[in-house]
C-alpha cells in the first residue's frame, strides 16, 4: 500500500458510505463529522458489531485523511470488505422490514375483507 494513495482510498470508501447512510437512515452524513454520524447512527438499529466496525473504519480514515497517518496493511485490506458487509447487512435488513410491513398490510387488508363479508 502506497501511503500517498491511502487518502484517496479512504476518501472514496467513506464518501460512498456517507451517501449510503444518508439515503438509508436519513442522516446528513456528508455534512457531519465522524463523531456526529456515529452519535446519530447509534440509535438507528445497526447491529453493534457492524456499528463498531464502521466506527473503526471511519476513525482510521480520519487519521489517514487529516493527520497524515498511514494505516496498516491489515487495516487497508479490511476496509473495503467491511464497507461492503455494512451495506449488504443493513440493506438486507431494510428489505426484510419492508417485506414484513407488506405482509402485515396484506394480512390487515384480508382480515377486513373477511370481516366485512361475515
Where are the language model's segments positioned?
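Membrane-proximal, non-transmembrane interaction modules
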Residues: 1-118
Amino acid at each position: 500500500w502506497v501511503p500517498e494513495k491511502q487518502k484517496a482510498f479512504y476518501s472514496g470508501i467513506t464518501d460512498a458510505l456517507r451517501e449510503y447512510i444518508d439515503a438509508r437512515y436519513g442522516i446528513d452524513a456528508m455534512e457531519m463529522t465522524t463523531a456526529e454520524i456515529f452519535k446519530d447512527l447509534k440509535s438507528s438499529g445497526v447491529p453493534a458489531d457492524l456499528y463498531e466496525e464502521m466506527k473503526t473504519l471511519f476513525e482510521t480514515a480520519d487519521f489517514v485523511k487529516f493527520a497524515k497517518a498511514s494505516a496498516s496493511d491489515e487495516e487497508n485490506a479490511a476496509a473495503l470488505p467491511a464497507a461492503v458487509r455494512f451495506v449488504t447487512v443493513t440493506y438486507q435488513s431494510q428489505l426484510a422490514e419492508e417485506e414484513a410491513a407488506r405482509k402485515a398490510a396484506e394480512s390487515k387488508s384480508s382480515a377486513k375483507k373477511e370481516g366485512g363479508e361475515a
